[in-house]
Regions:
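Long, low-complexity or tandemly repetitive, helically biased scaffold regions used
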Residues: 2-226
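Long, low-complexity, intrinsically disordered segments
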Residues: 221-237
Length: 237
């Protein structure tokens, strides 16, 4: 592996680590947003139940509708988060692919390089596997979030006059948000594993980068042999 190739491989690993870290932050935001939406939904469900039990049924019906409006706001935030998540996961996938391609070009005749590559290859492979596993889980979460969002949008001003319609929308949104919550929890575990492997990979990549720069520095200090000067001729007689 030439010095330039070593540095390029290390850079690709660093980019993968950054992308996975950003994906992890987005997953945490999704967890917080879904948790907030579920709490809003609990409030809506409570007020919906009071509609039949209280003389102030119309008040609680309107209150439940307001909660669903807040739920729509929470759900409106999630598509952008899931889009950001896929952007980071796709970037991580590309960076892992680039790193593996460059590592395959390694000249393992050098024992130091061979040792570095042997350590890095399996770890960067784990990052790729975890990211590949995260994508379908993220897709499921996005689908459930969208269904919950649709359920919250289905409640119109006319629908608020019908407790049955309201309860149905709350039940649908609750079911889908519950599924999304489970998906995102699983997604969090997968991305955590990817992030841990990515950090280990970045640590090894730092060693590769440092060694490559050291070799460059040593090569630049090596004296360049000068061309032999021509032997002076004896003066002609």
């Amino acid at each position: 592996m030439s010095t330039d190739t070593a540095l390029s491989a290390a850079d690709a690993v660093f980019e993968a680590e950054q992308a996975v870290s950003r994906a992890r932050w987005v997953v945490e935001e999704l967890q917080e947003t879904i948790g907030s939406a579920l709490r809003v939904l609990d409030d809506a469900e409570l007020d919906s139940a009071k509609v039949k039990l209280s003389e102030r049924g119309s008040f609680y019906l309107a209150a439940a509708g307001e909660h669903l409006g807040r739920l729509r706001t929470r759900c409106n935030e999630m598509p952008e988060l899931t889009q950001d998540l896929f952007t980071h996961l796709n970037r991580a996938t590309q960076s892992v692919s680039d790193a593996r391609t460059l590592l395959d070009l390694a000249d393992t005749s050098d024992p130091v390089i061979a040792s570095e590559v042997a350590q890095l290859k399996p770890r960067i492979a784990v990052v790729g596997e975890m990211v590949a596993l995260a994508k379908p889980v993220a897709q499921l979460a996005a689908q459930h979030v969208e269904t919950a969002h649709q359920a919250s949008r289905d409640v119109t001003a006319l629908g608020l006059l019908e407790p049955v319609s309201l309860e149905r929308s709350i039940a649908t949104a609750g079911k889908e948000l519950g599924r999304a919550d489970e998906d995102v929890r699983l997604l969090g575990n997968v991305v955590d594993h990817a992030a841990a492997s990515a950090r280990e990979s970045a640590g090894i990549a730092s060693e590769i980068s440092d060694n490559a720069r050291r070799r460059m520095s040593e090569q630049s200090r090596d004296p360049v042999p000068s061309a032999s000067l021509p032997t002076p001729r004896s003066p002609g007689r």
